[in-house]
């Protein structure tokens, strides 16, 4: 085998080529690192945006659950409002009928039976949370009363309900029918 010996000129040329390759490699490595860092920053920003979006969606969902729960509670609380509203005219008619003065024994018996039915109806409504609105002698409140007449009466102060023409009712804390009243001027 023959060995080729490199001349110092060839060795210098090889070293120069190696240095050039190494410099190119370092330059490429720095460019790659810069590109990688940009990509990392871009992905981090995207990740942060997605995390924020997830947090907003979670908050929206929690708000939705709270609203839905509140709506269900409200529906359950006032579920009987429609039925109660339909029964109020019948209750008014019972009260008018009970105000009649019986003139014979048969009418008295009928009136007693009606009083029992009336009490049962009032008790059933009370169990559902229905209560009459107090009106006579109270200060007029447009949230509870509907003024249909104004009168002048020295026995009452100004803006006081003098007479109740039709009873008003509340279901729990909601007015289902305001009292129709006469108000003192």
UniProtKB/Swiss-Prot annotation:
User: Which CDD domains does the record match to this protein?
Assistant: GrpE (cd00446)
Asked if Translocase is a keyword of the record, the answer is no
Pfam families, sorted: GrpE
Q: Cellular location of this protein?
A: Cytoplasm
Q: Which GO terms describe its cellular component?
A: cytoplasm
- One biological process term in Gene Ontology: protein folding
Q: Where is this region: Disordered?
A: 1-37
Listed GO MF terms:
adenyl-nucleotide exchange factor activity; protein homodimerization activity; protein-folding chaperone binding; unfolded protein binding
Give the record's keywords alphabetically: Chaperone, Cytoplasm, Stress response
SUPFAM superfamilies found in the cross-reference section: Coiled-coil domain of nucleotide exchange factor GrpE, Head domain of nucleotide exchange factor GrpE
InterPro entries in the cross-refs: GrpE, GrpE_coiled_coil, GrpE_head
Does the keyword Cytoplasm belong to this entry?
yes
Q: How does it assemble?
A: Homodimer.
Q: What does this protein do?
A: Participates actively in the response to hyperosmotic and heat shock by preventing the aggregation of stress-denatured proteins, in association with DnaK and GrpE. It is the nucleotide exchange factor for DnaK and may function as a thermosensor. Unfolded proteins bind initially to DnaJ; upon interaction with the DnaJ-bound protein, DnaK hydrolyzes its bound ATP, resulting in the formation of a stable complex. GrpE releases ADP from DnaK; ATP binding to DnaK triggers the release of the substrate protein, thus completing the reaction cycle.
Family annotation (NCBIfam families): PRK14140.1
The text of the family note is: Belongs to the GrpE family.
Q: What is this protein called?
A: Protein GrpE
Which organism was this protein described from? Answer: Bacillus pumilus (strain SAFR-032)
- This protein's gene is called grpE
């Amino acid at each position: 085998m023959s060995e080729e010996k490199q001349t110092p000129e060839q060795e210098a040329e090889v070293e120069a080529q190696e240095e050039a390759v190494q410099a190119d490699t370092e330059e490429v490595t720095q460019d790659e690192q810069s590109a990688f860092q940009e990509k990392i920053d871009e992905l981090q920003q995207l990740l942060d945006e997605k995390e924020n979006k997830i947090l907003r969606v979670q908050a929206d969902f929690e708000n939705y659950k709270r609203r839905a729960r509140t709506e269900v509670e409200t529906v359950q609380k006032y579920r009987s409002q429609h039925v109660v509203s339909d029964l109020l005219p019948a209750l008014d008619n019972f009260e008018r009928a009970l105000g009649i003065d019986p003139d014979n024994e048969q009418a008295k018996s009928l009136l007693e039976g009606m009083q029992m039915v009336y009490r049962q109806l009032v008790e059933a409504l009370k169990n559902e949370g229905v209560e009459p609105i107090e009106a006579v002698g109270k200060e007029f409140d447009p949230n509870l009363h509907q003024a249909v007449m104004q009168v002048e009466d020295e026995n009452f102060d100004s803006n006081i309900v003098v007479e109740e023409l039709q009873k008003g009712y509340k279901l729990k804390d909601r007015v289902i029918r305001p009292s129709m009243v006469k108000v003192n001027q």
